[in-house]
A protein has these predicted regions:
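Short helix-initiation/N-cap motifs at beta->coil->alpha
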Residues: 6-18, 61, 78-80, 94-108, ...
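Flexible hinge/capping segments at coil-to-helix
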Residues: 57-73
């Protein structure tokens, strides 16, 4: 793209506000494409495909599916697709900033379950193999992960991002990076 990026870390629930206010040009943080988000933002070609997984403590036998969340408590990032999915199954959701905090609440027994990207849980378990939780369900359909930018009649920036993503896919870089950081290829739906 010929630009030098400036990386800005922020809480999940403020990422889109920062994009809206022009503090960021894009958000690269595992953003799932949804109909609601597509009303406001233009998305690149997906660079990843993930499934939402449901995690519970290892000793939990009451929750084995998303349907079992009715009346249970979860912790998820505010405004995330995971929060929305948990609520759609009747869970009460506690807003949390990080996966680390969520897992601490789960393993301490302060929440019943949590939802997140399957690859995020796998990554956590690779670092913490003795963590006291298990995955009991995941969505059948993969979510598309892409980069949102503000909608504009001038699509040059979005086109440049799409070209870069396709070049990274074609030369195998996306596959290599996803295998390195997630232990599997999430760069294609296959």
């Amino acid at each position: 793209l010929g630009v030098e990026p400036e990386y800005v870390e922020s809480d999940w629930d403020s990422l889109f506000a920062g994009l809206d206010a022009g503090r960021y040009d894009m958000v690269c943080n595992g953003v799932e494409v949804t109909e609601e988000r597509a009303k406001t933002y233009a998305f690149t070609t997906p660079y990843g495909y993930i499934h939402t997984a449901l995690a519970v403590r290892k000793d939990n036998t009451d929750i084995t599916s998303f349907e079992d969340l009715k009346g249970k408590t979860t912790a998820n990032s505010l405004a995330s697709t995971y929060m929305e999915l948990a609520e759609s199954y009747g869970a009460t959701v506690q807003g949390i900033d990080t996966l680390e905090e969520t897992i601490q609440l789960l393993t301490a027994g302060r929440i019943d379950a949590t939802l997140n990207a399957d690859v995020s849980f796998y990554d956590y378990l690779n670092v913490h193999p003795d963590a006291d939780f298990k995955l009991v369900a995941q969505t059948a359909e993969a979510s598309h992960v892409a980069i949102p930018v503000l909608k504009s009649e001038d699509t040059a920036y979005l086109d440049a991002l799409n070209t870069a993503i396709e070049e990274l896919r074609a030369d195998g870089t996306l596959k290599t990076l996803s295998e390195k950081y997630f232990g599997q290829d999430i760069s294609s739906e296959n």
